[in-house]
């Protein structure tokens, strides 16, 4: 009976895992990527054609453009879609731990290594390993990574046993690797091994036609999550969203829409629900002649007053929240309120 129960439990787990992989494959289809702009469609097209191959893919683009989304779509459109997809962000790891994270370590390899630990390459065996911010990998570890790309073998940190893996690498960076090669910070031979197929993900400011669709997607997402009945955004608010440049790209737009949904007082997102950074996009930058037309201190004070009023409006008068939105202490906010007679 115990054996039968274990067999049934195993079968149930296998069934659950299969269902989960099918759901992920559906979620991360290329068709699910929101885009109508020509530049983004070009990137999706290149990534889609590369998916069926075994080749290494290098995804380039600014932070927040959706490089990991492209990497996942490549995996789930590839013959490895039923195998693991693992991601590691090298920028989020201390430099001295990157090698151990990628290749694992043996017991006693360094202080605190009290047991053997497999790295991402072993855990992603037969699947895809997404190495984000690959430009952050130190030179000694780059040598080891090059060997994996060439031979699919490596040793764990502190070990001598050769580990064999079958892993497809999709790498990404927001840095200029060609420039890093000239400065000696990135190996040229590794670069050519990585740069077999290159996918350039455009910044959001270069794909403005996608903003309305992305805005609607995030509006619906965060309305559901926060149990809000917000289904619409005003024309004026959308105009501001279209004018803004988004230095943080799609990730910033998502943040803007989440904040707008949370702080909105009605059923429609209006301009007052948008952060000051976006609202300031409604007018062209003032020329130096206009900005210098008056006292400098008066210009600064007028801007401070406008920011404080907006923060208090967003925080519904709660000074603690307003100070947090402004990035200052509550004490500093109280001082400015007294200074400008804004009690």
Segments predicted by a language model, with ranges:
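Nucleotide-binding/hydrolysis machinery
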Residues: 5, 11-12, 18, 80-83, ...
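Conserved RecA-like P-loop NTPase ATPase core
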Residues: 20, 43, 65, 88, ...
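Conserved post-Walker A coupling segment in P-loop NTPases
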Residues: 32, 45-111, 122-138, 203-208, ...
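Short gly/ser/thr-rich secondary-structure transition/capping motifs
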Residues: 108-115, 151-156, 289-291, 311
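Bacterial C-terminal helix-turn-helix
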Residues: 146, 291-343
């Amino acid at each position: 009976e115990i054996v039968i129960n274990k067999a049934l439990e195993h079968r149930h787990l296998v069934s659950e895992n299969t269902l989960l992989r099918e759901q992920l494959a559906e979620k991360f289809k290329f068709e699910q990527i929101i885009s109508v702009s020509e530049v983004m469609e070009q990137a999706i097209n290149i990534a889609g054609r590369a998916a069926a191959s075994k080749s290494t893919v290098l995804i380039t683009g600014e932070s927040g453009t959706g490089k990991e989304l492209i990497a996942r779509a490549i995996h789930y459109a590839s013959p490895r879609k039923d195998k693991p997809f693992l991601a590691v962000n090298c920028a989020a790891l201390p430099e001295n731990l990157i090698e151990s994270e990628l290749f694992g370590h043996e017991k006693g390899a360094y202080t605190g290594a009290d047991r053997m630990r497999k790295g991402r390459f072993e855990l992603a065996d037969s699947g895809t390993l997404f190495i984000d911010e690959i430009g952050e990998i130190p030179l000694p570890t780059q040598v080891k990574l090059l060997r994996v790309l060439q031979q699919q073998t490596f040793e764990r940190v502190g070990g001598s046993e050769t580990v064999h893996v079958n892993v497809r690498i999709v790498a990404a960076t927001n840095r200029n690797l060609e420039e890093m090669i000239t400065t000696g910070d990135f190996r040229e031979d590794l670069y050519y091994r990585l740069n077999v197929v290159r996918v350039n993900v455009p910044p959001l400011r270069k794909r403005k036609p996608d903003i309305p669709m992305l805005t609607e997607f995030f509006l619906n997402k965060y309305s559901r999550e926060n149990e809000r009945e917000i289904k619409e955004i005003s024309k004026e608010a959308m105009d501001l969203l279209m004018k803004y440049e988004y230095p943080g790209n799609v990730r910033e737009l998502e943040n803007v829409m989440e904040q707008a949904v949370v702080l909105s007082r009605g059923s429609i997102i209006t301009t007052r629900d948008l952060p000051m950074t976006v609202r300031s996009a409604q007018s062209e930058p003032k020329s130096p002649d206009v900005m210098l037309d008056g006292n400098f201190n008066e210009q600064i004070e007028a801007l401070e007053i406008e920011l404080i009023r907006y923060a208090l409006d967003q925080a519904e008068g709660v000074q603690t929240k307003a100070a947090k939105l402004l990035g200052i202490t509550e004490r500093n906010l109280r001082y400015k309120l007294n200074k400008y007679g804004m009690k």
